[in-house]
Regions:
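Mobile, glycine- and charge-enriched loop segments
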Residues: 23, 34, 257-284, 382-383, ...
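Flexible glycine/acidic-rich beta-alpha junction loops that bind and position SAM and/or redox cofactors
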Residues: 44-45, 141, 187, 244-249, ...
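Mobile, glycine-enriched helix-loop/loop "lid" segments at the mouths of ligand-binding/catalytic clefts
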Residues: 98-117, 316-334
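Glycine-rich beta-alpha loop elements in corrinoid/cobalamin-binding modules
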Residues: 2-103, 306-312
Length: 421
């Protein structure tokens, strides 16, 4: 019987599963202390305040969890451990906040050997297995749909150059950099790239996430980082095709910077990908404008997600009355959470058509054969399964069936006009 079990809720759609797992643990081992944590748990812990959960970690877990385990071993009150919500009967007590953010250099590098037996299950896009690397944490920007800055208070922390170099050296050929704001700050990013080159690091593939304004204003970073991988993809938070739409989500950049960043990255030999937000309040002309923008500027590798008010964000707070009672499994960015302006049937017709214009559509400009030409022979079966599975995103009927099934749980409401504006 374990003394402590940790249950993760990294995303809002995992709240219910996390509670289910916690209850299973308690049913098997009633005396086990159950700690919930993860990004979603920390930024919006309310859905996890359930009978089977003993405490919720509401800050970085790297120092909180060892402190909690020590308190349990010494039988001292867990309410003395900073950064927790602790169940006490039917009430919850919030312990004192941590005095300062955890230094990333105080966090040990991942013990990846512990998951070697499952390594083949870690994959990203065409690349398998994949390794995750963190060089920084947090984001100082304040996008209305994003919970990262809310959790970390707009702070931004960096791991030291030497530690990052060692981490890159310890990983395999396919690396996903999990930073929310890669290439930032520019001076440190340039120093890091040079240190990695000096160490002789070169990967088969790297994927990093960044903002277009950071790249557009610092093209020298592209030159410095490009030698580090045979294929290097940059994922941009594209979000929208107009300045007005960017302003509505407080993106703090403009379309000109998006285009400048994409042009510079392509010219330097990078793959350009990213994501656009599809607003349920769109009219038909908004879909047409996005299609025209994608076609004109070559963003066919981008993805499209339905604008989703994630818990803990300003957008969630604004829409809370219309969202009341919606089940958490719908917060996957492919379900509707309020009644769309065009009605669900027409909305999904246009949403599916948007996906059909993407590179994932095997019936489009890039055929299935075209996809397989760039895949290693050993990966063909894997990528074929992935591509065939994604084809349901091109079918309005598949979305509509899921939508109607979900509405049996809770009907949608319209968003008040004042919130739409």
């Amino acid at each position: 019987r374990p003394e402590v079990v940790g249950v993760a809720a990294m995303h809002a759609l995992e709240y219910d599963q996390a509670v289910t797992v916690a209850r299973q643990v308690k049913r098997i081992s009633p005396g086990t202390f159950v700690l919930a944590g993860g990004h979603a748990a920390a930024v919006y812990p309310a859905p996890l305040r359930k009978d089977a959960v003993d405490a919720i970690c509401v800050d970085d877990g790297e120092e909180i969890v060892p402190a909690l385990v020590t308190a349990l071993e010494k039988k001292t009150p867990v309410t003395e451990v900073p950064g927790l919500l602790v169940a006490q009967g039917t009430d919850w007590v919030e312990t004192t906040p941590r005095p300062e953010r955890t230094s990333l250099d105080a966090v040990p590098l991942p013990a990846r050997d512990l998951v070697d037996r499952w390594r083949s299950g870690y994959h990203c896009l065409l690349f398998r297995p994949a390794w995750a690397v963190e060089t920084s944490r947090g984001c100082p920007f304040r996008c209305r749909f994003c919970s990262v800055w809310k959790l970390y208070g707009r702070s931004f922390r960096e791991r030291s150059i030497g530690a990052v170099v060692e981490d890159f050296a310890a990983t395999g050929p396919h690396v996903f950099v999990v930073d929310d704001l890669f290439f930032s700050p520019p001076a440190r990013s340039l120093e890091l790239a040079r240190a990695l080159v000096k160490r002789g690091i070169r990967k088969r593939w790297i994927l990093a996430q960044s903002r277009s304004d950071v790249v557009a204003r610092n093209p020298d970073l592209l030159e410095a980082w490009r030698p580090l991988a045979r294929d290097f993809d940059i994922f941009f938070g594209l979000e929208a095709a107009t300045n007005g739409a960017l302003d509505r989500v407080a993106k703090d950049l403009d379309i000109g910077e998006t285009l400048a960043a994409a042009d510079a990255a392509r010219a330097a030999g990078y793959g350009v990908t990213g994501n656009f937000l599809v607003d349920p309040d769109w009219r038909e002309g908004d879909f047409s404008a996005l299609w025209d923008f994608v076609e004109a500027h070559g963003f066919r590798r981008a993805g499209y997600t339905i604008l989703t008010p994630l818990p803990g964000t300003p957008l969630f707070d604004d829409l809370a009355p219309a969202l009341a009672g919606q089940p958490w499994f719908k917060y996957d960015m492919h379900h509707l959470l309020w009644e769309p302006r065009l009605g669900a049937e027409r909305f999904f017709e246009l949403y599916a058509e948007t996906w059909r214009r993407s590179i994932l559509h095997i019936g489009g400009d890039k055929s299935l054969f075209g996809w397989l030409r760039q895949v290693a022979p050993g990966q063909m079966a894997y990528i074929t399964r992935i591509l065939l599975r994604t084809q349901r995103m091109m079918k309005a009927g598949a979305y509509l069936r899921e939508h109607r099934e979900a509405c049996r749980v809770k009907d949608l409401q319209r968003v008040p006009a004042s919130v739409e504006a």
